[in-house]
Amino acid sequence: MHVKGLAKLAVLAALVIGGGIYAAVPVATFAESKTLALQIALDRRGFSCNTIDGQWGRRSQVALATYCAVNGYAVPPSPELARDILFPRERNLFRTETVTQREHDALVRIPATPEGKASLKAMGYETIMEMYAERGHLTEGALRRLNPGVAWPNPPVGTVVKIPDFINGQDAKSPKVSVMRVTLSRFEITAFDEMGRLVALFPCSIAADKAKLPPEGELQVTTLIPNPDYTYTPERVSRGGRIVRRIFPPGPNNPVGTSWMGLTLPGYGIHGTPKPERIGCAESHGCFRLANWNAVRLRKMCETGTSVVIEK
């Protein structure tokens, strides 16, 4: 099916489920939630709701509807049925990890000033909670619910923590992308392979200032950089003052996160973020911002020259 046809099909499928939120079904523990299991299964296949939280909202609805549209399935009427019908044999949803001294030693405090940020060796995680939430593609609230007895935000060395298992998930099998479509009105990026098949969906943030939005049209990927640094340039300088640029070191709390894809439009790119739970709105400075794990995954699916279509 043509790329645009598939994109429209995904939108139509999303409309089928409407804007309602399904009522939560009581479960013995949060880890047994079928909504949580469904979000994990969809994420593994490249259809992301952004941060996994076990709640059935718009982003989860769109991820499910798009996955169903691509695969020719009817959209089940509830997340519980979707889990049972689409992924009845999904295994190894979770893994456990043990908090180490090395992880504690790697924590940093991110200063408020550009000078302070530039002085760091790395813009790492500020808490163990932030570290493990990102590792499991979770909201911090969901991480707490999965591990209710843990002393958050910085549990001691030796604490065992349960998170969704993405190390051995299907994300390692992601296909190569030929075209990406950035749909500004829906705050999302869809990725298509060389046959025009929709293979991934990622929520994104766009510029809050409409004047900074790139024009509609086609761009290309020019650079792919893991763990980028960031050049900070002040927006305002006092009259007669000198512009002092600062280089912020790499790390998950770097303003562009852990991945950068530069585009043929100078100054614009697709990148990560230090605040994944805020993805999906108008708040960036002009670029397209994804959760770090989605930015990394998308970068690995692309190459220089990959087409990027900007559309309303």
Residues covered by each model-derived region:
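Extracellular LysM carbohydrate-binding repeats and other cell-envelope/extracellular binding modules
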Residues: 58-104, 144-175, 179
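Secretory/export targeting leaders with adjacent low-complexity proregions
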Residues: 121-201
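Sec-exported extracytoplasmic/periplasmic mature domains
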Residues: 43-47, 65-73, 87, 134-138, ...
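Solvent-exposed, polar/charged alpha-helical surfaces in well-ordered, non-transmembrane soluble domains
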Residues: 36, 40, 58-66, 127-134, ...
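Bacterial N-terminal signal peptides that target proteins for export
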Residues: 2-10
